[in-house]
């Protein structure tokens, strides 16, 4: 089974995760074509940095103007449906998983306001996050990734609304090993993608045969360990009885495997 492992070291955004997949070999021109086919602006920024100590790829979708004052759960569902309707209707349900986790975390962080009415801008969510999610799925599709795993990591308690939301979202990420990562550095939407899309949070071991390693960074000039996410592409094999307690679905398609 072709799999992707994600390892977070510090700062984490959706764009960093996309940048890592470009570093993995997904052509930017392919991503632009997917945006165009979905009726979305093609004005993203991407830049490799092969001379840095950590060779990583920078990617960013700049914010656009003239946005509504509030951004609520219903808006995410509506916009996402429009994005997926043209070329990838099968991805609509995948987005729902992310949004459900996101709004639940936002509700916990923002005065327990119900998830369906909380303003998601208060925790840093924007419409551009949906475009980045679409490109992340498109990149996985290009690489023929069948399932996604995240390496466990420990986190600190959040202080701001965004940090508290990230902490509330990352219920499966908790590990007692290693230096805790500040939730203030983890974008809630990126946290929701890890939590909503990962088949499991588990360490890489002998069952995973890595083929390629790539990095995405939030810095175009100085990628470091703290502002870089690592992504490992390879093959996951397991002959054990059960890894997960549920029948796994791979990006909206039944994998046919009880793991």
Model-identified regions with their sequence ranges:
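Acidic, glycine-rich active-site loops and adjacent beta-strand->loop/helix elements
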Residues: 9-10, 38-39, 127-129, 152-159, ...
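Mobile "lid/hinge" segments at catalytic clefts and subdomain interfaces of large enzymes
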Residues: 28-30, 139-257
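Extreme N-terminal starter segment of soluble prokaryotic enzymes
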Residues: 1-5
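Short coil/turn segments at secondary-structure boundaries
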Residues: 114-118, 207-210
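Flexible, glycine/proline-enriched loop segments at strand-loop-helix junctions
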Residues: 84-92, 118-128, 153, 157, ...
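N-terminal glycine-rich phosphate/adenylate-binding segment common to multiple enzyme folds
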Residues: 103-106, 114-117, 124
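Conserved phosphate/anionic-ligand binding catalytic regions in large, soluble enzymes, centered on
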Residues: 6-19, 118-144, 255-257
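Glycine-rich nucleotide/cofactor/substrate-binding loop typically near the N-terminus or early
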Residues: 23-111, 172, 181-184, 191, ...
């Amino acid at each position: 089974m072709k799999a992707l492992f994600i390892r977070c070291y510090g700062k984490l955004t959706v764009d960093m995760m996309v940048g890592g997949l470009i570093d993995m070999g997904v052509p930017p021109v392919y991503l632009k074509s997917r945006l165009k086919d979905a009726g979305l602006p093609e004005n993203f920024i991407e830049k490799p940095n092969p001379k840095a100590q950590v060779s990583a790829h920078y990617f960013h979708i700049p914010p656009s103007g003239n946005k509504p004052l509030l951004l609520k759960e219903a808006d995410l569902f509506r916009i996402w449906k429009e994005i997926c309707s043209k070329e990838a209707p099968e991805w609509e349900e995948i987005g729902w998983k992310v949004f459900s986790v996101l709004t639940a975390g936002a509700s916990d962080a923002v005065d327990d306001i119900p998830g369906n009415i909380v303003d998601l801008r208060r925790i840093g969510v924007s419409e551009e996050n949906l475009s980045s999610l679409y490109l992340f799925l498109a990149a996985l599709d290009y690489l023929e990734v069948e399932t996604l795993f995240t390496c466990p990591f420990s986190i600190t308690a959040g202080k701001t609304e965004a940090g508290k939301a990230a902490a509330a979202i990352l219920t499966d990420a908790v590990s007692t090993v290693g230096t805790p990562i500040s939730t203030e550095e983890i974008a809630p939407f990126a946290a929701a993608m890890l939590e909503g899309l990962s088949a499991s949070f588990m360490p890489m071991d002998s069952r995973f045969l890595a083929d390629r390693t790539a990095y995405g960074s939030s810095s175009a000039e100085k990628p470091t360990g703290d502002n870089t996410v690592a992504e490992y592409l390879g093959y996951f094999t397991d002959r054990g009885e059960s890894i997960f307690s549920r029948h796994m679905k791979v990006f909206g398609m039944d994998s046919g495997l009880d793991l």
